[in-house]
Regions:
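Pocket-edge structural micro-motifs
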Residues: 14, 65, 99, 209-211, ...
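Aromatic- and carboxylate-enriched substrate-binding clefts and catalytic-loop regions
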Residues: 139-144, 150-332, 452, 457, ...
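Terminal accessory/anchoring regions of large secretory-pathway or extracellular enzymes
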Residues: 263-265, 272-928
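Short, solvent-exposed helix-helix connector turns and helix-capping sites enriched
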Residues: 79-80, 209-212, 696-697
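Short, solvent-exposed loop/turn segments at secondary-structure junctions
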Residues: 17-19, 67-71, 103-105, 148-151, ...
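Catalytic alpha-helical scaffold of carbohydrate-active enzymes acting on polysaccharides/glycoconjugates
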Residues: 2-141, 148-207, 227-241, 275, ...
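Glycine- and acidic
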Residues: 21-31, 100-111, 139-140, 212-216, ...
Length: 928
């Protein structure tokens, strides 16, 4: 193709989202008022530009609706003329819409069935506001996910749903998803064209459409200069055909309509909005405004690439902005409890223990109508990214209310399905003969989703741990009785605060493919006082079994964690610490000495435990107190850690500020990092880069290497990386040995629970690449670096002008955090299937039914999960919001709204140094 034939296709894509984390549900600027204002101005500007008869004809737009449920509903309710104008422009084929989601969901936070239903409703729904219903024939089959989130398995689902490609940021500043992770770097043909985007877990692929934001315009001085740079690449043959430049950014940004400036500097490029784009295209005959639906079929595919980490356009190109606040863990744990109830129901159905109630259970969980309050509908609404961020470290109070209302409804539906399943399944249990003994029925949760990857098998033993009914605990205590399980399953009975807890290791051999549940009988026996001699032991300075040995120094610090004689830990392994103080040079606070207490010495032959207490002050009179219970079981190669941290409450007078924030909750910015139980593995990348394995909610097990310096050497050391979506566990390995870290979702859960800190040459001795792992904690620090063919100023000015680089650590102030971990050392690269299976069933523990021999009563030890709804109502005062649909709630919020009354806004004037002002001035001149 000769140069005269080559075009630059310029696609403009405003990202429309009226549902925000740092604003509420007001019709004014404290809510979605700015969205209403800017959306109207964009359409007005398009009309004016069209009336001016530029050479290119109508300016084409690729509208990017983040969701139907909030944004389109609100447009239809409060801005129907605007929605009608978009519909009309699409009818005239000036515009198109690209694919987002029905519920503004973080798509990697969903399972397969949920994502497929979300996409289905996005396109067509009974509310009548699906993209295909509103914009027939103008739905481009290309997705721009909310926050450009991506994880493995999405490509396969997109292929099934007819989605042909995905728009992902490949930007030069910290509003990006792919740039630091794609190796080799995309060449010019790929950066301004199409790339085959491969899955790392199958042979599936889709189109990658590299996408850019307004910050990238800054990096090239102006849109006109950027066009000319691309043209030079076409002239030199670096781009051998047409080029595509897709510009996608939040619709509520003033950059679309133009920034008001003093008259003396109105000449500045990058401030003129759509009109500036129109003038540039009008002056350059080789540039055309384009819709993706029209131009992508004309473009060739240039090479291929794979993105191995899980990514989003948050801080550090990952999930920091939605996963690292204290409330993110708290909220997600609520959701996982609802999920547990749902999965119990599905497991009982798939095990053919429920037949009569199958249809009503399925209707409650997965009704295909978006008008029905099903579990899946409310799970999708709950999993909106807005309910978890972007606002940091606090969310808007109204956003907390709506978020909790959706998890409340999801739990309500899951509980109803659970009760129907138990009602039928328990009748079969009641019919079984007990011979005067307690009967226990155990159901490992094997049905966790729609796909084969979400159907689990039992490939290992697993841990069963539950409190006995009060009447049984009383009888055991009163009559000095113990428990014998007739099947001779390893177990221990432990008493704490008057209640008895039974802990068992259930052998894999008890299950088979035809029957993935078992019955056990509990016999009361005389207490045995004989001590069992084996290699299970807890002393004042060590904890060990046949596989693992943990040692403590004279200060009570854990300094060695050995598996089969090989060291897996470093000094201060499992340390609690807080980084507090100045942003650039904070102090790290931690305990100088830990108290150790032997809880179980191992003499019962089943388990041994040590409690480690750490206490330190951040400020005088402001202590942090951490308790960690470390447990080993006989003949099991795993360490279990129960963590309970009480953080002191240090509040300040700072608050989150941007041009539209209405979050007034104050905090102390000196909170920088929080490490509740920091893992310091002795796993060194001295021969190759370290590797992370993880399992996501689609059931996909995948890995990524910590090789970001191959893309950009400046990213050899990374202060925080949150690039692993995790349904239960992740591992770190140097391909010779590895360590799996998993969590119990019913205690604490987070979809990205382990931020990482990476050092190329180690944290103390220069032995090789090292990593710190921070379960349920928070790291912070310098952002990633972004290679560029531009001036590099997008990254510099982006940090100056954006207030989103806030630490989430202040959200932990005054909070109590409890979580349970499993640490499983292993040899090799990929974790063995046996360890994966154990971690899977630790994450979502088995469901248990007990039958009392006296009154034949059925008891459920996990019944507290069923009461979550009442807990949510008490804590979050949601009686009002759960009694309304969303539009009723919005009208309730706005019942006293006065559009003429000024609304408070948290704004902060620009405080620019001389260097920054000179950069902006010189770049402005160069952009002319």
């Amino acid at each position: 193709m000769n140069i005269d034939q080559k075009k630059i296709f310029f696609a403009l894509s405003p990202h429309i989202n009226y549902y925000h984390s740092y604003r509420g549900d007001s019709k004014g600027v404290a809510g979605f008022g700015k969205d209403i204002e800017i959306m109207g101005k964009i359409l007005d500007a398009l009309d004016v530009i069209e009336d001016e008869k530029f050479s290119f004809g109508p300016m084409k737009i690729s509208w990017d609706y983040a969701d139907n449920f909030w944004s389109i509903q609100l447009q239809r309710e409060f801005q129907e003329d605007v929605l009608d104008r978009v519909v009309e422009r699409c009818k005239q084929k000036k515009d198109e819409v690209i694919i987002g989601s029905w519920a503004n969901t973080g798509q990697p936070m969903l399972d397969t069935e949920e994502l497929m239903q979300d996409i289905t409703w996005h396109l067509e729904n009974e509310m009548g506001i699906g993209l295909k219903q509103l914009f027939p024939g103008r739905v481009a089959p290309y997705a721009r996910t909310q926050e450009t989130m991506f994880t493995q398995g999405m490509i396969e689902i997109y292929n099934k749903m007819g989605i042909k490609g995905i728009c992902m940021y490949y930007s030069t500043y910290a509003f990006d998803s792919l740039r630091p992770f794609i190796y080799p770097r995309l060449n010019a043909n790929q950066r301004y064209g199409l790339v085959k985007f491969n899955s790392s877990v199958s042979k599936s692929s889709t189109l990658l459409i590299p996408t850019y934001g307004f910050g990238d315009v800054v990096d090239y001085f102006s849109i006109k200069r950027w066009f000319k740079l691309i043209r030079k690449m076409q002239e030199k043959g670096q781009i051998d055909g047409h080029a595509l430049l897709l510009l996608n950014f939040d619709m509520d940004a003033d950059y679309w309509t133009g920034i008001k400036l003093p008259r003396i500097i109105r000449w500045m490029p990058k401030t003129g909005g759509l009109r500036e784009f129109a003038k540039a295209v009008d002056q350059l005959d080789y540039v055309e405004f384009a819709n993706l639906i029209d131009v992508i079929p004309k473009l060739p595919i240039h090479g291929e690439c794979t993105c191995y980490p899980d990514v989003a356009d948050g801080l550090w190109n990952g999930f920091y902005s939605w996963a690292q606040k204290y409330d993110n863990t708290k909220f997600w744990t609520y959701g996982q409890k609802a999920r547990w109830l749902k999965c119990v129901s599905d497991t009982l159905v798939s095990n053919v223990l429920v037949k009569n109630n199958t249809d009503p259970i399925n209707k409650i969980i997965r009704d295909k109508s978006d008008l029905i309050e099903s579990y899946i509908k409310n799970k999708c609404l709950f999993a909106s990214t807005t309910n978890f961020g972007l606002s940091t470290p606090r969310l808007h109070p109204q956003r907390i209310k709506t978020a909790i209302s959706y998890v409340y409804r999801a739990h309500k539906a899951a509980r109803k399905a659970f009760e129907l399943a138990i009602d039928e399944a328990s009748k079969k249990l009641i019919q079984q003969d007990q011979d005067g003994h307690y009967l226990i029925q155990i159901f490992p949760i094997t049905d966790r989703g729609l796909s084969e990857d979400e159907k689990l098998t039992i490939d290992s033993d697993f841990l069963l741990k539950f409190k006995l009914p009060d009447e049984l605990s009383v009888e055991l205590s009163k009559n000095q009785k113990g428990i014998f399980i007739e099947e001779k399953i390893p177990h221990g009975l432990y008493t704490d605060d008057g209640s008895s807890t039974l802990e068992c290791i259930i052998p894999k051999s008890k299950f088979n493919a035809e029957k993935e549940w078992i019955n056990l009988t509990l016999n009361l026996t005389s207490k045995s006082v004989s001590k069992i001699k084996n290699n299970l032991q807890a002393t004042s300075n060590s904890l060990s079994n046949k596989f693992i040995k943990i040692s403590f120094d004279d200060q009570g610090k854990l300094y060695t964690f050995k598996f089969n004689g090989e060291e897996y830990g470093q000094q201060d392994f499992l340390e609690t610490a807080v980084s507090f103080g100045d942003k650039k040079n904070p102090d790290r606070f931690t305990s100088l000495k830990n108290e150790l207490r032997v809880l179980r010495d191992g003499s019962d032959g089943f388990s041994a435990s040590i409690v480690m207490k750490s206490e330190f002050e951040i400020l005088k009179g402001y202590p942090v107190i951490a308790l960690k219970k470390l447990t080993l079981y006989a003949n099991q190669p795993y360490l279990f850690v129960e963590t309970d941290v009480q953080f002191c409450d240090i509040q300040g007078e700072d608050f989150f500020v941007n041009d539209t924030s209405s979050v007034y909750t104050t905090y102390d910015v000196r909170w920088r990092e929080v490490m509740p139980c920091e893992i310091k593995p002795k796993i060194i990348g001295d021969k190759d880069y370290l590797r992370v394995w993880k399992k996501n909610y689609f059931g996909k097990v995948s890995y990524f290497d910590l090789d970001m310096e191959k893309v950009d050497s400046r990213n050899a050391n990374i202060d925080c990386l949150v690039a692993n979506i995790t349904d239960g566990w992740m591992t770190l390995t140097n391909k010779e040995k590895g360590l799996l870290i998993g969590y119990n979702s019913l205690k604490a859960a987070n979809f990205a629970f382990t931020p990482l800190k990476i050092k190329k040459s180690g944290f103390s001795k220069p032995e090789g690449q090292e990593v710190r792992i921070n379960p349920f904690g928070n790291y912070h620090g310098e952002l990633l670096k972004y290679w560029t063919k531009g001036c590099g100023h997008a990254a510099i000015l982006g940090e100056k002008f954006s207030n989103h680089n806030q630490s989430a650590a202040p959200s932990y102030s005054g909070k109590n955090l409890k979580f349970d971990l499993i640490l499983a050392p292993y040899l090799g690269d990929r974790p063995p299937s046996q360890i994966i299976s154990f971690a899977d069933h630790f994450c979502l523990p088995p469901f248990i039914i007990l039958k009392n021999p006296e009154n034949k009563k059925i008891e459920i030890p996990q019944s507290d999960i069923m009461e979550l709804g009442e807990e949510l109502k008490r804590e979050f005062d949601i009686d009002d919001v759960i009694s309304m649909n969303y539009l009723e709630w919005v009208n309730h919020v706005n019942k006293n709204f006065d559009p003429s009354a000024p609304e408070e806004q948290l704004k902060e004037g620009l405080n620019l140094d001389l260097k920054t002002m000179l950069i902006m001035l010189i770049d402005g001149i160069r952009g002319l």
